Regions:
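N-terminal post-signal-peptidase region of extra-cytosolic proteins
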Residues: 1-2, 129
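Exported/periplasmic ABC-transporter solute-binding proteins
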Residues: 7-12, 18-171
């Protein structure tokens, strides 16, 4: 499938998004477990949906959260979406009180319409993105140059400007 080993080029974390008016008065991650809170998640088979559930499991193991935190939050889920953009759209349209998305999904287009609630690093799930030249690539030299660009400072700066986490320097 690939000509050489793939390389890590960017990473992403999860955040909780809330509608600007925040009528459910969500101030902390623990509030997601309160009865009556309407939450939208990506479906479990979608990467962000899987990562969201892993976050809930990690939180339930912390003393600051109830041991049944995951079950209580999942009981509040009103919709499971096929992709992360649909999660953001439902929260933006005020069809839910909260949703879990990637940090990069809080784009400038929606940033004014949504609030961000951070998930601390010890509870968060790191999504890692890899890049490689495929064996069937018609222009492997050009693809290789593109990969070099993405891994170098200019490419990492562009990714960082769009909310991705920079990867350690390659040698």
């Amino acid at each position: 499938m690939v000509r050489e080993a793939s390389e890590l080029f960017a990473q992403n974390t999860l955040i909780v998004i809330l509608p600007n008016q925040n009528s459910a008065k969500i101030e902390a991650l623990q509030d997601l477990a309160k009865p009556g809170i309407k939450i939208v998640l990506a479906a479990p088979e979608v990467p962000v949906g899987n990562y969201s559930r892993l976050f809930l499991e990690k939180a339930a193991q912390q003393s600051a959260f109830p041991t049944d935190y995951k079950e209580r939050v999942l009981a509040n889920v009103v919709s499971e979406e096929p992709n992360v953009k649909q999660v953001a759209a439902k929260v933006q349209l005020d069809e839910a009180d909260a949703g879990i998305v990637y940090g990069t999904d809080l784009t400038p287009e929606v940033a004014g319409k949504l609030k961000r609630l951070e998930i601390p690093a010890e509870l968060n799930q790191l999504a890692s993105y890899y890049i490689a030249v495929t064996k069937t690539c018609p222009e492997p030299k050009a693809a290789g140059k593109f990969i070099q660009f993405i891994l170098a400072e200019p490419g990492q700066k562009i990714l960082s400007n769009h909310g991705f986490i920079r990867v350690p320097k390659h040698h």
